[in-house]
């Protein structure tokens, strides 16, 4: 192993992996299994996956503590982890000089041995990914799911193949997945010029990661890459940005950029659907999930609360329809799917007040959806690292959706307080535990208290899961 102070000027293989977290390690593992040589660089002196890397590739050269320019000057291919911006000067210069700059998703797309179904969006990605995976499993399909959620995509290719006697041709043959169902972030899509997915969806677009992107258009452009080479485009007809993406795809020269390539479009939304689209219909006083004129199931039979989860369910149904999953299996999954932790998760009812953990609400759009989706009077706990976001949409949602108290924590609490001035009672606390205690004292029977921060967690917590766990523990401590 080489360090910054022990530099070998012969860069083996001319492939550089940038970043040695979970994704970088999966890239190293995949290349090592294929017998390809590479070097690894990381800005940290002790990256988290270093020890495991050295068990996979004991002789690999590592350059730690910075991004050494000479490493990139000799690179033909640079595999960038999602947490590293391609705008880093050494990476941008290498790309200008002809190096191929990709991420793990491009490698995955090249080597995937089954159709890819891909999900992105500012909010709802993990819910739709796991919901669709459950639909496929209830249909009896062997699928692999991962990506931004859970297992890195290259590790999906490296997993031991599973013998499934009821699906294999002769009862002994290892069975490939019927589909890879993958959640993708904008960071992953930045380096994915052409995914060639069988089906893909952009669930929604709202401002996020504005500390990484110059503006919303740059963020949106990264998301749009998911449709390149896609056979079935699933689109949210309620989202103007997504529909603009669709028009761009329809206007693209398919032979050059591969945006639809003889494919089709399926739309979903919360309005009444036409033809083969998915949406909501009212019948005999009840609201139904519907495909065209066909009512599929009452919306209130879903386990997940919130109007935003109806949109998630409709997106999953549209993707499942493209995959030709049986309708009964898809609806069964919707009736039983419990949701994921930290996503509008019911915690407890104490003295008539319902407490919800939506710690995964790390951007303004997610919190707006949580507020709109939760009926009745509400107390909102929010705040953290706003990542340069505009909080104005939060102000409008609070005015329109019966939020009578906002309790703020974290780095950008003063910024949010200024945005909400004059529209709602706002209190600031120094800790999440103090926010819970204050919410308990100021809430009334019939209220819902929602932790939905509209911010990242890293100013006060390890991650959004840590933040959610602290909230849940604080709420449970209120129990008599």
Residue ranges and their predicted role:
Residues 1-103, 107, 305:
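N-terminal leader/targeting and accessory segments in enzymes
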């Amino acid at each position: 192993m080489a360090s910054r102070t022990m530099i070998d000027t012969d860069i083996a293989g001319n492939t550089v992996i940038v970043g040695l977290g979970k994704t970088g390690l999966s890239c190293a593992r995949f290349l090592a299994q294929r017998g390809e040589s590479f070097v690894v660089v990381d800005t940290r002196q002790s990256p988290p996956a270093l020890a495991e890397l050295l068990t996979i590739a004991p002789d690999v050269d590592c350059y730690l503590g910075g991004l050494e320019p000479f490493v990139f000057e000799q690179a033909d291919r640079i595999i960038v982890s999602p947490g590293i911006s391609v705008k880093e000067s050494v990476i941008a210069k290498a790309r200008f000089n002809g190096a191929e700059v990709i991420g793990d998703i491009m490698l995955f797309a090249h080597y995937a041995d089954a159709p890819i179904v891909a999900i992105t969006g500012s909010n709802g990605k993990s819910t739709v990914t796991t919901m669709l995976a459950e639909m496929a499993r209830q249909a009896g399909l062997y699928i692999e799911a991962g990506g931004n959620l859970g297992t890195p995509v290259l590790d999906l290719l490296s997993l031991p193949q599973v013998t499934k006697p009821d699906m294999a041709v002769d009862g002994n043959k290892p069975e490939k997945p019927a589909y890879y169902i993958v959640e993708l972030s904008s960071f992953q899509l930045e380096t994915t010029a052409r995914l060639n997915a069988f089906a893909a969806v952009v669930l929604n677009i709202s401002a996020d990661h504005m500390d990484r992107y110059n503006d919303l258009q740059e963020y949106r452009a990264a998301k749009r890459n998911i449709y390149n080479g896609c056979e079935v485009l699933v689109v949210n007809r309620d989202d103007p940005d997504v529909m603009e993406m669709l028009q761009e795809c329809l206007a693209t020269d398919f032979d050059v950029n591969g945006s639809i390539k003889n494919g089709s479009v399926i739309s979903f939304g919360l309005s009444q659907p036409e033809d083969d689209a998915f949406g909501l219909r009212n019948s005999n006083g009840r609201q139904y999930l519907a495909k065209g004129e066909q009512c599929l199931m009452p919306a209130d039979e879903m386990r997940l609360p919130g109007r935003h989860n109806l949109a998630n369910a409709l997106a999953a149904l549209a993707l499942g329809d493209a995959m030709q999953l049986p309708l009964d299996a898809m609806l069964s999954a919707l009736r039983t799917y419990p949701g994921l932790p930290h996503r509008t998760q019911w915690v407890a009812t104490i003295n008539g007040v319902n407490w919800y953990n939506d710690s995964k609400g790390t951007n303004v759009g997610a919190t707006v959806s949580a507020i709109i989706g939760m009926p009745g009077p509400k107390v909102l706990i929010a705040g953290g690292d706003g990542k340069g976001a505009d909080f104005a949409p939060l102000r409008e949602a609070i005015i329109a959706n019966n939020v009578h108290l906002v309790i703020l924590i974290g780095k950008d609490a003063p910024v949010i307080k200024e945005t909400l001035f004059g529209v709602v009672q706002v209190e600031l606390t120094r800790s999440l535990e103090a926010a819970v205690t204050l919410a308990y004292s100021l809430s009334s029977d019939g209220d819902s208290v929602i932790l939905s921060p509209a911010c990242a967690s890293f100013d006060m917590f390890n991650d959004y899961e840590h933040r959610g766990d602290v909230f849940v523990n604080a709420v449970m401590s209120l129990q008599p």
